[in-house]
Structures are given as C-alpha cells and as structure tokens.
Swiss-Prot record:
This is Methionine import ATP-binding protein MetN. Keywords: Amino-acid transport, ATP-binding, Cell inner membrane, Cell membrane, Membrane, Nucleotide-binding, Translocase, Transport. InterPro entries: AAA+_ATPase, ABC_transporter-like_ATP-bd, ABC_transporter-like_CS, ACT-like_dom_sf, MetN_ABC, MetN_ABC_transporter-like, NIL_domain, P-loop_NTPase. Residues 2-240 form the ABC transporter domain. It comes from the Bacteria. It is found in: Cell inner membrane. It is a peripheral membrane protein. It comes from Xylella fastidiosa (strain 9a5c). It is an enzyme of class 7 (translocase).
Length: 334
C-alpha cells in the first residue's frame, strides 16, 4: 500500500547539507499496524510526514496504492490528504469546543451541516466522548484530548492513519486506553496505521511489523515477534533491553556467581505454558538455575523468556531437546 523507493530527505543548515533520512526502501502493507522506532533524531518524524508530504522528499519515489505521490499537483495532494488522517503528540486542538474540532476537517470538504453534525455525533460516540461534545479542550484530560484528536483524524473516512508519538505525553493507564482504541480502529475499520515511537513497549502491544531507524538509516525491519525476540542490530537490542528493564552490568555480575552454561530460552505461543524445562532436565540429567524470566504478549501472541544456567548431566543434549521442541536458544555463556 505504501512504498518507499530510494526515498530520502536532506536539509540545508548553515550552508551545509544535513541528511535526515538516507535512501529508504520499504513497503507497508494495507490493513496492518506498522511501527517506526528510533531515538531522537533518528528520522522517524521525517519518514512519517513524508507519507502525507508534510515533509517533501528530497529524492526517490513514494507510492500509495501504486500512485507516486511525489509528482502530485496541489489538487492531487489535497485529495491524497483526505485519505490520510493524522494524530499528533501534543493534540494540536483548536480552542473551540470538542464537536467543533471534529467538524473542522469536514467543513474544509464543503459537507453540509446535516452531514457534518451526523458524522461528528457518530465519531464522538465511537471514541466515548458523546457527553463532551460541548466541552472545551482546556476542560479535558490528556487522554480525552487525544481521543478528540483521533475522532478528528477519522472524520473524512481515511484509509491511512498516521500517529506521531501519540502516547508519549500520556500516563501509563491512559496510554493503554489509547492503544486499545487504535487497535479497535485497525480491527473494525480496517485502517492502515503507521505510528512512530521511541518506546518498544508500544510496538510490542499494538504493531504487526516494525522498522528500526538509527541516525537516518533503516537498520532492521520485520515482524514484531522476530525483531522483538531476536533483535539483530545493537540499536534494536538496546530498545528491547530498555523495555525489559535489563541492567547489563548487574546481569554480568549475576553470571559471575553461577556455574555452567548460560542460555536464554524463548517460548512463543502455547509453548509458553508447557513445563518443558522440567521435562528436559529429567531426560538429560541437567540441573538448571533460573536467573531471570518473564511471560508477556506481543500483540495477542504470548511469549516467555527464561535465562538459565545449565550444569551437570548433558547440557548439549538439553539444548538439542529444547531446539527439537521449537524453543529458540541463545547461548550467553558457553
């Protein structure tokens, strides 16, 4: 649906050229939730805003439904933007009351008052704000403001929804509510959602696939289950470790206090709940010492990770038994 073909972005600054996004080749599929993660300055916002040409690409091609949007004239660009909704980090609401904010993009299309009023009422009910139609933004909580922003973004019935750090200004409980609403939008309305964030936990909870940016370069991309559980690039690994609150120095200290081969076992799906560790220990005579562990979900898929020290018995046979059971093994210390 969305294709970046050698798309890049340069800026002029103080007489020199600065590269915000290096040539990028990537496809975002229709109907998926696609996440873009990176630290500040990685090029996330630039990449997102190129999709609706709030940022003009410096070169390359960017296709939406097969159409190269880099060559659109003003009228074509206006038509494109009606198919793309956008939600902002800091809400960007007008000072008018809630219903007025949602009605604003519809007024720009020239819709009749009757159609506008009906659509606004429908959207406010959909995001759970029907009781706040005549409330001003200053009277709303952060989560309510973001829901107004979501309703406004949906007003013109877009095919694509762009989300610019939509949860970074929210508390954890409100973040969960907003992510659940976005998941419902994707599930029930079939919208393609592209979101940027610096939090791997947001990617884990809502996205189907993810792209990792580092200083303007695409360094890793794939299914969230693959990228999250088996990160390849150092930037990706750092995001995952931040999410799991892993202190590498403390981990090294823990490792120094135990004997044996140290491995990380990753279980996905229903295997997460099977007593495989005990069974393999009995079959191979291996003693195990659990150093850390967690069970969580990537979107709807359960997964578990255990870091264990294996000693005695036959640790090589134990690792082979885990592999035969479909468990991914990462050797941390031989």
């Amino acid at each position: 649906m969305i294709q970046f073909k050698d798309s890049y972005k340069h800026y002029g600054a103080n007489g020199r050229e600065v590269t915000a996004l290096q040539p990028l080749n990537l496809e975002i599929h229709a109907g998926e939730v696609f996440g873009i993660i990176g630290h500040s300055g990685a090029g996330k916002s630039t990449m997102l805003r190129m999709i609706n040409r709030l940022e003009e690409p410096s070169g390359g091609h960017l296709l939406i439904n097969g159409q190269d949007i880099t060559v659109l004239d003003r009228m074509g660009l206006r038509a494109l933007r009606r198919q793309i909704g956008m939600i902002f980090q800091h809400f960007n609401l007008l000072s008018s009351y809630t219903a007025g904010n949602v009605a604003f993009p519809l007024k720009l299309t020239g819709a009749s008052d009757a159609k506008i009023n009906a659509r606004v009422a429908e959207l406010l009910a959909w995001v759970g704000l029907e009781a706040h139609a005549n409330t001003y933004p200053a009277q709303l909580s952060g989560g309510q403001k973001q829901r107004v922003g979501i309703a406004r973004a949906l007003a013109t019935r877009p095919q694509i929804l762009l989300c610019d750090e939509v949860t970074s200004a929210l508390d954890p409980q409100t973040t969960t509510t907003v992510l659940q609403l976005l998941a419902r939008i994707n599930r029930e309305l079939g919208l393609t959602i592209v979101l940027i964030t610096h939090e791997m936990d947001v990617i884990r909870r809502i996205c189907d696939r993810v792209a990792v940016l580092d200083t303007g370069r695409l360094v890793e991309t794939g299914l969230v289950t693959d990228v999250f559980l088996h990160p390849q690039h150092p930037t990706t690994r750092s995001f995952v470790m931040e999410t799991e609150h892993i202190d590498t120095s403390a981990l090294d200290q823990d490792f120094s206090l135990v004997n044996g081969r140290i491995v990380r076992l990753t279980f996905i799906g229903t295997d997460t709940y099977l007593p495989l560790l005990g069974r393999v220990a009995r079959e191979t005579g291996v003693d195990y010492n659990i150093l850390s562990g967690r069970i969580d979900r990537i979107k709807e898929t359960p997964y578990g990770q255990l870091t264990v020290a294996l000693s005695g018995g036959d640790p090589v046979a134990a690792q082979a038994a885990f592999a035969a059971a479909g468990i991914h093994i990462e050797e941390l210390r031989a």
